[in-house]
Amino acid sequence: MQAIDLAYRAMKPIAVAALIVGLGMPFSAYSETAAPKCDAPLHLLRLANPLTHFAQKLATRGPITIVAIGSSSTAGAGASSPATNYPNRLAEELKRLFPTHSITVLNRGVNGEEVDDMLKRFDKDVVVAKPDLVLWQLGTNSVIRDQMFTDHGAAIRDGLKRIRTIDADVVLIDPQFAPKVIVKPEVGPMVELIATTAKQEDVDLFRRFDVMKRWRDDDHMAFESFVSPDGLHMNDWSYACMAKGLSLAIAEAAQRPVMSAKATSHMVP
């Protein structure tokens, strides 16, 4: 499987076909010490659908608002500081990719929450912000508490329905691949349920579980390299690598309508 370096160089304008094909800024820019290579296969990064609302704001050069809602993975548990959680890293990555655009990423993560908890605050934490893109991280806490969704994804669909009322793009983010998650028998069904719901509802999915699983299975990274000492949460390196991959996926999906057929054929494995 072809893998790509998730580093990149600034582009004016961004060449969409190059976004997910080895760009040039080394990940070690984030650290004074040697760090593992941040990479992922094309098929794990590429979002299924174009981000049309994000694309419209790019075209009109209007300010772009992104809401990242979720639990501790969004809040930043395991990060050494708020600056190194994934939403703040994502804001940095998108500003490098789109230096002439105003892009704001709002962190609406709350430790320990499940989908029903998030839905209770959707109005004040998502709807009021009038975002162009919603990143919804979900599923992990239900897995580690041995509480598989019994509604067959109805709660997720409820959230997606509410996001549609504000004309925002949405990307679901599935659980992390970490020791305290993968020991749970519910993790496989949860990852599958989120993927199935995303496909049925025609929304995008960032496959965090599979990206992190690849670090372990294919890159042979020790869990300590990308999981915090608690065995559950991500660390500075993995939050930054996740943000880098997600930024490239967002940028490509937001510009996909202008891609040529030739460029598309080279990007799809």
Indicate where each model-derived feature is located.
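N-terminal secretory targeting modules
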Residues: 1-67, 76-80, 95-101, 129, ...
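Short loop/turn segments at strand-loop or loop-helix junctions that form parts
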Residues: 69-71, 138-139
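Short hydrophobic segments within beta-strands
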Residues: 67-70, 173
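Alpha-helical cap/lid subdomain in secreted, periplasmic
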Residues: 88-104, 113-268
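Extracytoplasmic small-molecule ligand-binding "clamshell" domains
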Residues: 75, 85, 103-106
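Catalytic nucleophile serine of serine hydrolases
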Residues: 72, 109
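Short, solvent-exposed loop/turn elements at domain surfaces
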Residues: 74-78, 115-116
